[in-house]
Amino acid sequence: MGIEFTKYHGLGNDFILIDNRHGSEPMVSPEMAVEMCDRHFGIGADGVIFVLPGTSQTDYQMRIFNSDGSEPEMCGNGIRCLAQFIAELEKTTEVGKSYRIDTLGGLMTPRLEAQEQVTVDMGLPRLLGSEIPTTLVSRTEKVIDQPIEVAGQSWLVTCVSMGNPHCITFVEDVKSIALETIGPQFEHHVAFPQRTNTEFIEVLRPDYLKMRVWERGAGITLACGTGACASVVAGVLTGKSDRRCTVELPGGCLSIYWSETDGHVYMTGPAKRVFTGVYEM
């Protein structure tokens, strides 16, 4: 038995996309997703994304398994790839076409742009301790420049949920961060009961941030869309950045805007098709 798939990437954050429109649950188990994501013995990816039928209020549903088999609520680069994949399935190239996508992190609305770009209305950032979730503060408080001890060092962190948890810390030089050592300690810190994604941000200008990320369930990746969104929100909350920023990641740049009008965060970036294939079970 073989499973047809298409591989996409958003700034090097790569995914296996599967057409799952004829079933209400992912056709691949978390264990199989781990095998498919293996870069030596499988296809190789940061995660597997499934396009499932939508509800009466949405066009489609998005589900994801990370490369470790865990299931995140949302993925910013992944939803851009999902939008391009849906357009491929629907055989449309209509610029301005949008989709209402149901995710475990809430409703997301990606819109197709020219030149393989996708803009996503990521919705409202969630800032309360109970919404992250984290025990760094009370359930009704915001986490802004809160101290935390990690790897024998004190860090000031700001926490934001974009449908999934993010812990953001601003540093002088992102290159100097030993991400492979510090990242897992943030992810599994006792203050984050559902674990966390962690972004290390260097402010080059108020409208230009440089970011490295340790993703919950995936480790070091070349890009994280929700992380870029959360980082701009954190930058505004701490007075370090503008509401409209370019965020530079190892895989390229994203344009992020936290609107004062509706409070939503908007992300624009690429989603590129790599290849199609059949994975033999």
UniProtKB/Swiss-Prot annotation:
Keywords carried by this UniProt record: Amino-acid biosynthesis, Cytoplasm, Isomerase, Lysine biosynthesis
Cytoplasm recorded as keyword: yes
Lineage of source species: Bacteria, Bacillati, Cyanobacteriota, Cyanophyceae, Oscillatoriophycideae
GO CC, alphabetical: cytosol
Localization of this protein: Cytoplasm
Functional summary from the UniProt entry: Catalyzes the stereoinversion of LL-2,6-diaminopimelate (L,L-DAP) to meso-diaminopimelate (meso-DAP), a precursor of L-lysine and an essential component of the bacterial peptidoglycan.
Listed name of the protein: Diaminopimelate epimerase
Molecular functions per Gene Ontology: diaminopimelate epimerase activity
Catalytic activity: (2S,6S)-2,6-diaminopimelate = meso-2,6-diaminopimelate
